[in-house]
């Protein structure tokens, strides 16, 4: 571990020199690449330097302990060694986490697809609740949200919604939201007061750049049609809605949110690129025989990951066995505790594979 850290520190110093070099600065593309690399390893180098400083102080304190005869000063030195040892252990743990292999998609924007599952209209209303939850989380994080497509029901629910959230590290924070979300509550239409169970599925995809996925024009079939509103009625007379079919994979994406056919096509292509990248990465993972099944789940869209129980004001994440009794706050976008716990759990599983 320390040989790798020494190498990173030397690389950091070299990058420091390069980004200040007038010749390099003239080549903006090259300069931006160096700045990006410099930022990526900056935290681990800073923590390593702090670790070395603490280690040096601990050596000095131990030296004093060996040489000091005065009982009071020895007691002070022992106390200092203990404090420094705890700090050293904490920094060492942090360094191990920082050295874990990075998910190349972590810094990307994220596309979230929400679909009503079993439960009819109640499932569609719950899908709408989930959409608002993620939009409010994005607001809290200062991210930009762009609706790519939404298919509403007559009662204000959502059959399907696709939203792009743009912000640094958006995918790293929300990638564990993929799966089946279940709701238990008394529907507004239920006169007998019985609790119903409904579900919605969430798919979380990193936004794919054009360079990430090659799409040949001849592999696409593009159909245009009139936009429809809740219940299927036509909402305009121009053919502005777009359906893009990727023939080799069979993936179909429809977008009708914009009045412009061109804008709907652009949005559909964004979603298609993300789905193709996700498909390619899932196939790659399946080919790896030793692919780990982590505590936070396999990312399988059919996996039940969380239950929202309204009568008990309870939200339970089944992968973590973590229950919070503040359902309304969670639905208002207060997801930090779940997001943080899922990331920590994933890191712990990765660390096990290193041991």
From Swiss-Prot:
**Keyword Transcription regulation on entry:** no
KW Protein biosynthesis (keyword) present? yes
| GO CC field | cytoplasm
Which residue ranges does UniProt annotate as crossing the membrane? none
Instruction: List locations, semicolon-separated.
Output: Cytoplasm
Q: Got any disulfides in this one, which pairs? A: none
Per its record, what are the GO molecular function terms?
translation release factor activity, codon specific
Keywords, ordered alphabetically: Cytoplasm, Methylation, Protein biosynthesis
Classification via Pfam families: PCRF (PF03462), RF-1 (PF00472)
The UniProt entry lists the main location of this chain as cytoplasm
Q: How is it modified after translation?
A: Methylated by PrmC. Methylation increases the termination efficiency of RF1.
Taxonomically, the superkingdom here is Bacteria
N5-methylglutamine found at: 233
Q: What does this protein do?
A: Peptide chain release factor 1 directs the termination of translation in response to the peptide chain termination codons UAG and UAA.
What family does the entry list?
A: Belongs to the prokaryotic/mitochondrial release factor family.
HAMAP family, per this entry?
Rel_fac_1
Alphabetized NCBIfam families for the sequence: prfA (TIGR00019), PRK00591.1 (NF001859)
Q: What is this protein called?
A: Peptide chain release factor 1
The gene name on file is prfA
């Amino acid at each position: 571990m320390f040989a790798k850290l020494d190498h990173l520190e030397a690389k950091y110093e070299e990058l420091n020199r390069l980004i200040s070099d007038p010749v390099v600065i003239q080549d903006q593309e090259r300069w931006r690449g160096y700045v990006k690399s410099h930022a990526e390893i900056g935290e681990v180098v800073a923590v390593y330097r702090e670790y070395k400083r603490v280690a040096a102080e601990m050596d000095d304190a131990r030296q004093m302990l060996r040489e000091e005869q005065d009982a009071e000063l020895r007691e002070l030195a022992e106390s200092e060694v203990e404090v420094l040892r705890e700090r050293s252990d904490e920094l060492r743990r942090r360094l191990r986490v920082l050295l874990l292999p990075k998910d190349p998609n972590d810094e990307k924007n994220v596309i979230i697809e929400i679909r009503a599952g079993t439960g009819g209209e109640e499932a569609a209303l719950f899908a709408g609740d989930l959409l608002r939850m993620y939009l409010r989380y994005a607001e809290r994080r200062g991210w930009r949200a762009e609706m790519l497509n939404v298919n509403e029901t007559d009662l204000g629910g959502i059959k399907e919604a696709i939203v792009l959230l743009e912000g640094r590290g958006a995918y790293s924070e929300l990638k564990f939201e993929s799966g089946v979300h279940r709701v238990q509550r008394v529907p507004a239409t239920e006169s007998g007061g019985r609790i119903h169970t409904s579900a919605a599925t969430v798919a979380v995809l990193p936004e794919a750049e054009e360079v990430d996925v090659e799409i040949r024009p001849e592999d696409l079939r593009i159909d245009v049609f009139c936009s429809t509103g809740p219940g299927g009625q036509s909402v305009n007379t121009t053919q502005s809605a777009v359906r893009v079919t990727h023939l080799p994979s069979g993936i179909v994406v429809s977008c009708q949110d914009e009045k412009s056919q061109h804008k709907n096509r652009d949005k559909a292509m964004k979603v298609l690129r993300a789905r193709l990248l996700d498909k390619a990465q899932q196939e790659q993972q399946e080919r790896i025989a030793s692919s780990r099944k982590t505590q936070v789940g396999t990312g399988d869209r059919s996996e039940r990951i969380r239950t929202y129980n309204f009568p008990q004001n309870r939200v339970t994440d089944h992968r973590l066995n973590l229950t919070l009794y503040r359902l309304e706050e969670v639905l208002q976008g207060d997801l930090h505790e779940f997001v943080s716990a899922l990331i920590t759990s994933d890191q712990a599983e990765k660390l096990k594979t290193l041991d």
